[in-house]
Amino acid sequence: MVMKFLIVGVGAIGSAYLAFLTRAGHEAAGLVRRNPVNRIKVEGIWGEFEIPVKTFTKVEEVPFIPDIVIISVKSYDTEEALKKVKPVVGENTFIMIAQNGYGNYEKAVEIYGEGKVILSRIIFGSKVIKPGHIRITVSADEVVIGDPSGKIDEEFLKNLARTFTEAGIPTRYERDVYKYLVDKIIYNSALNPLGALFEVNYGSLAENPHTKELMNRVIDEIFQVIEKAKLPCFWKSADEYKKVFYEKLIPPTAEHYPSMLEDVKKGKTEIEALNGAIVELGKKYGVSTPTNEFITKMVKAKELFNLKDT
């Protein structure tokens, strides 16, 4: 079945959705702030192709009411993007959050209500070579989609997952999608900021006793927050998670550098949706998070230094 998709934010992840859905014959368009692209070249582990695409800078230019609006902007632009697309969000349009980090789904529900927002856990890596040219570098698992509120029809979500898979982005439906998101928040919060601060890959962080101790502290604090905030989670304890983290999760991605490393060089990261969000949740629920707070401030300091250099 041909569907209509509007992808908001045509960066690394958004470009992948726009290119693969267009190639599969769906009516897909991108919404960008500036510099529209008319072709996307894809290379990497999911194959190589180049395809003409439609992108617009104004929401009024979008020539259809989409079935799905995919939000793939950086976390700090989420609220603005959600409000910007309102004119094309029809009665039967769903918002899909294709971002990692805490707070994006919550913002979407605040604006559009439960039963209107699909949450996804993105775990493939895409790198922008230049605008209109991306490389799919890694895929640790399928994309997971679902509705934490349980209000969206399961068959619709299963069919949507099948649509993405048939388009070339392996996806499955999971009722427990929020647990997958929390899992990714723990992983990203432990690895990304330290990788960005020290400019090293994940394997190096695990091998260095000092960064390993910092990661352990980050994880311990996150689990204290998870318990107090009653966030859904696969793991019963920080120790249970750490065992899997060091033995199973890091080895396959040991050579990987965090995307936050590129972001911090440009002076803007998603730290507020990761460790920064843990700090805020800690304050809300009375949990002390000194390591997460220190790392958040370190990343924000590096952002500021790099902004002054640009």
From Swiss-Prot:
Keywords: Cytoplasm, NADP, Oxidoreductase, Pantothenate biosynthesis. Its EC number is 1.1.1.169. GO terms for biological process: pantothenate biosynthetic process. Pathway: Cofactor biosynthesis; (R)-pantothenate biosynthesis; (R)-pantoate from 3-methyl-2-oxobutanoate: step 2/2. It comes from the Bacteria. Gene3D superfamilies: N-(1-d-carboxylethyl)-l-norvaline Dehydrogenase, domain 2, NAD(P)-binding Rossmann-like Domain. The active site is at 184 (proton donor). Substrate binds at residues 100, 188, 192, 259. NADP(+) binds at residues 9-14, 100, 270. One of its GO terms (molecular function) is 2-dehydropantoate 2-reductase activity. It catalyses: (R)-pantoate + NADP(+) = 2-dehydropantoate + NADPH + H(+). It is found in: Cytoplasm. GO terms for cellular component: cytoplasm. It is an enzyme of class 1 (oxidoreductase). InterPro entries: 6-PGluconate_DH-like_C_sf, 6PGD_dom2, ApbA, Ketopantoate_reductase, KPA_reductase, KPR_N, NAD(P)-bd_dom_sf. The keyword Cytoplasm applies. Pfam families: ApbA, ApbA_C. Catalyzes the NADPH-dependent reduction of ketopantoate into pantoic acid. PANTHER family: 2-DEHYDROPANTOATE 2-REDUCTASE, 2-DEHYDROPANTOATE 2-REDUCTASE-RELATED. Belongs to the ketopantoate reductase family. This is 2-dehydropantoate 2-reductase. It comes from Aquifex aeolicus (strain VF5).
